[in-house]
Amino acid sequence: MRIVVAVKHVPDIQADRTLGQDGRLARDGGDGTLNEVDENAVEAALVVAESAGGAEVIALTMGPDDAVDAARRALQMGADSAVHVLDEAAAGSDALGTAHVLAAAVRKIAEDGPVDLVVTGMAATDGLTSLVPAALAAELGIVALTLAVDVTVADGAVVVRRELDHADETLRAALPALVSVSDRANEARYPNFAAIMAARKKPVAVWSLADLGVPPDEVGSAGARTRILAAEPRPARKDRVLVTDTGDAGAQLAAYLVEHKLA
């Protein structure tokens, strides 16, 4: 069994973020990290692989040079190998372009043996569109089971459990399939020192768009089918108003709401 888990290197959510002139998030000059929910995706892939016995887990990422750090983190957690799609022409890809490149990479990985399961996180913290998993499945022509909190594989099928607002839902699909994992799925393992050192010896393949047979004008800013029309930083949070209750706190609160047109 072969499992591909897609991971993304994103700006640290605790760090200050700036927008470029094109309205996109500036990614240079700041600390980055593995997308948080992708840790849950890697954990889910590893659990499936361990239960299957002898399964191979391949981490897949795309992006600039430092994007490989996300793949290396997956290797430290237990993935067997990694692929980094590195090509300047892919910069600025929208969700559909990203899915197009990742699908081409999955197909190339499958040249060495069928890929049974593709696992992703439910969303990336730098965009939160949640579009890539479904778009990737569509590109590959396979079923997508989204927002999974539990993933198991048996008898040539994947079974996932989803937590909905008022009920749990269990879905089953024949392999190959794609599963996007919820941030409530599991608690990702923390690699120990031995795992971190062992990851240094694991192979990381670097592929260009040419290696994947993807024309540059189909992806990146040039091939994007969506455009950012406007973007601006979120306004700074205003200072809190403290009300001392001397018997008229309710009246003070009501006056504040009326003054700020909140009531």
Task: Tell me the role of every PLM-derived stretch.
Residues 1-263:
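N-terminal glycine-rich FAD/FM-binding segment characteristic of electron-transfer flavoproteins
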